Amino acid sequence: MNEASNHTAFFRGLRQMFGVTLILLLLCGFVFPVLLTGISSVVFPAQAGGSLVYADGRAVGSKYVGQEFTKPYFMKERPSAYHYNTYYEDAQGNRYYSDGSPFAGVSSGSNNYAPSNPALIERVKADIETFLAANPDVTREEIPTDLMTASGSGLDPHISPASAQIQIPAIAKASGLSEAALAQIVEDNTQGKLLGILGEDTVSVLGVNLDIAAAMGLVSVNGN
């Protein structure tokens, strides 16, 4: 009799355990995400859709995900180990980054090199030389640190105001826009500190480049 009672108690506990697991799975894995997605789609439709930025009626990026710009008349972003997941396809459908290396798939993060790692030193040296070649009026000592260092995610869409301003002369020559006009574009796309005290002032690279494209007549509608 005691053995039967023990078996009954065991299976009852097992049933309760599976029941709780199933309920939590449904609540946390289905009900909560669906409810949260539904509420956010109604209250914050743009943010729920990825905070997309539009130009000429089509999505060209997101406010919170950086992308790689290679044209000389566009502002440059911070380094990214995954080139901001920007790639091109050849005739055979093979995907490559802009430097010709194979596309690694959609990724984020960085190489996490130690400061003493020779690979990091070589990467920074190469990036400095590339930047100086594109910005001949700038000296090595004037380059802001964030232009040579990757963000934690490798996808940061912002740079510092100093990093934006130092690129203005070269962009002015390549785009035909005046430095004053470019300075105003940078100011228009500068976001201040949160509540005036948290974080640092930042410049949206995508926002700046969309305004540059609009000023050059490359896009007819700027949808920030």
PLM regions: where:
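Extracytoplasmic/periplasmic C-terminal soluble domains
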Residues: A162-N224
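Short, Lys/Arg-rich, polar N-terminal cytosolic tail immediately upstream
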Residues: M1-T8
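Flexible, solvent-exposed loop/hinge segments and secondary-structure transition points
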Residues: T8, R12, Q16, V20, ...
